[in-house]
Amino acid sequence: MAKSRNEPGNIELPGFSDTLQLTPKIDKPHYAGHRDRLKQRFRDTPDALADYELLEMLLFRAIRRADTKPLAKALLMRFGSIAEVLAAPEKLIAEVPGAGPTVAHELKLVEAVAKRSARSTVMEREVLGSWNKVIEYCTAAMAYETREQFRILFLDKKNKLIADEVQQTGTVDHTPVYPREVVKRALELSATAIILVHNHPSGDPTPSRADIDMTKQLVNAAKALNITVHDHVIVGKHGHASFRGLGLI
């Protein structure tokens, strides 16, 4: 059926027999301008952005047509900080309302890139001369894990890092460590020194009695085969503890 000339959206101009069709103006969604402004603020002063704003921007790729601010705030409310959001298990991230598998996968990808970047700053370097970088890497890799991990940094005779391996993963407050296996692996890699690292999911890096006893056993087992244990570092959300710094090695 032909559209009436008197219907809304049609305009008749004097001297013209045809009717002009006007296309209604479509407003951009409110979040479109917000995203542009947030990106510009990031370019100008990235350090001035709040944690939830940085997380908003991380979510842009996974959520292309919606406001990401509510989800960013919900994730921080659920897990506590950006670091804890990224370290959270993928399944738990996906369970946050508005997240789902795509968001969870995207955030775990960001975490993997961050860990790889931190690791690249210590590989093939003289580790003892780059100690702050080592601590930064271990903190990024382990401090926010929900279960204890026991990691070993294997060094050559020049104290360069030749391998970085997670030896064991345990429970929330315990990781089984077998000195014989640690020493065996060091010999396989021709390592002449090692640095022991594990995390405390509680956040408190204070060594336990069990940590101290296990370290003594490991030091003795390594010493028998001329392998030096430079340090045992415990990392947590609230800092780190060095056995050598505490006089425990």
Curated annotation (Swiss-Prot):
GO terms for biological process: proteolysis. InterPro entries: MPN, RadC_JAB, RuvA_2-like, UPF0758, UPF0758_CS. The keyword Phosphoprotein does not apply. The keyword Hydrolase applies. One of its GO terms (molecular function) is metal ion binding. Keywords: Hydrolase, Metal-binding, Metalloprotease, Protease, Zinc. A motif (JAMM motif) lies at residues 198-211. Residues 127-249 form the MPN domain. It comes from the Bacteria. Zn(2+) binds at H198, H200, D211. Belongs to the UPF0758 family. This is UPF0758 protein Oant_1909. It comes from Brucella anthropi (strain ATCC 49188 / DSM 6882 / CCUG 24695 / JCM 21032 / LMG 3331 / NBRC 15819 / NCTC 12168 / Alc 37).
